[in-house]
Amino acid sequence: MLWLLFFLVTAIHADLCRPDAENAFKVRLSIRTALGDKAYAWDANEEYLFKAMVAFSMRKVPNRETTEISHVLLCNVTQRVSFWFVVTDPSRNHTLPAVEVQSAIRMNRNRINNAFFLNDQTLEFLRIPSTLAPPTDPSVPIWIIIFGVIFCIVLVATMLLIISGIRQHRRKNKGPSEMEDSEDKCENVITIENGIPCDPLDMKGGHINDAFVTEDERLTPL
């Protein structure tokens, strides 16, 4: 009688869990690719851990808090570590909707990956899209970073204003001295008219240009 019951349960499970069955998901693991020489063998203990992680994930879904490890069925396990699994509802003898299983796996994807030391690329749920890892909190608060950036901008702007003011002040100081130098140069310039060197008229000191003084004026004192 017990053997008959065992075969009956096995037949039911085989009908529920099969490749491409309704609400079934295929899983593919690349343990050696991920861990290299530290790769572990996939055995019954690892299968039990996988079932436990799926049951743990399903318990977080509303109205699925009673999910047990025995409700998770695995089938078509290959040596290259790929298999199919379903989550059953023993009370109704059918599999849970794929949408619920998918939601549970996505919410706990990181926990499942960490349990096997894998990631989304080496532990693939082929019909369940990968999820992004939750954002990590920065060690420095964001407001401090923003304040630091603004402070640096204000500091640079202040330095530029100071440098610009110093340059303008220097230009103003150089202006009058350059004008005086140019006037002095103009006063000392000797022009040549008709081959005769002529001194410019000294307007400040009343200097008379000798080129325009007649011989009588030179000999006759004033």
Curated annotation (Swiss-Prot):
Q: How is it modified after translation?
A: Glycosylated. Glycosylation is required for plasma membrane localization and for its cleavage by BACE2. Proteolytically processed in pancreatic beta cells by BACE2 leading to the generation and extracellular release of soluble CLTRN, and a corresponding cell-associated C-terminal fragment which is later cleaved by gamma-secretase. This shedding process inactivates CLTRN. Three cleavage sites have been identified for BACE2, two clustered sites after Phe-116 and Leu-118 and a more membrane proximal site at Phe-125; the preferred BACE2 cleavage site seems to be between Phe-125 and Leu-126, Phe-116 and Leu-118 act as alternative sites.
InterPro entries with a match to the protein in the record: Collectrin, Collectrin_dom
Please give the residues the UniProt entry marks as glycosylated. Answer: N76, N93
Report TM segments: 142-162
Q: Membrane topology type, per the record?
A: Single-pass type I membrane protein
Q: Which residues are exposed on the Extracellular face of the membrane?
A: 15-141
Q: Which residues carry this modification: Phosphothreonine?
A: T214, T220
Coiled-coil boundaries: none
Is ATP-binding given among the entry's keywords?
no
Residues the record annotates as the site (Cleavage by BACE2) are: F125, L126
Q: Enumerate the subcellular locations listed in this protein's record, separating them with semicolons.
A: Cell membrane
**Topological domains (Cytoplasmic): residue ranges?**
163-222
* One GO biological process term: positive regulation of amino acid transport
Give start and end of each Collectrin-like domain: 21-222
List the keywords (alphabetical): Cell membrane, Glycoprotein, Membrane, Phosphoprotein, Signal, Transmembrane, Transmembrane helix
Can you tell which superkingdom this protein's organism belongs to?
A: Eukaryota
A GO cellular component annotation in the UniProt record: plasma membrane
Q: Which family does it belong to?
A: Belongs to the CLTRN family.
This molecule's function is given as: Plays an important role in amino acid transport by acting as binding partner of amino acid transporters SLC6A18 and SLC6A19, regulating their trafficking on the cell surface and their activity. May also play a role in trafficking of amino acid transporters SLC3A1 and SLC7A9 to the renal cortical cell membrane. Regulator of SNARE complex function. Stimulator of beta cell replication.
User: What note about domains is in the entry?
Assistant: The cleavage site containing the double Phe-Phe motif acts as negative regulator of shedding by BACE2.
Q: How does it assemble?
A: Monomer. Homodimer; dimerization prevents CLTRN cleavage by BACE2. Interacts with SLC6A18; this interaction regulates the trafficking of SLC6A18 to the cell membrane and its amino acid transporter activity. Interacts with SLC6A19; this interaction regulates the trafficking of SLC6A19 to the cell membrane and its amino acid transporter activity. Interacts with SNAPIN.
- Name-wise, this protein is Collectrin
Its source organism is: Bos taurus
The coding gene here is CLTRN
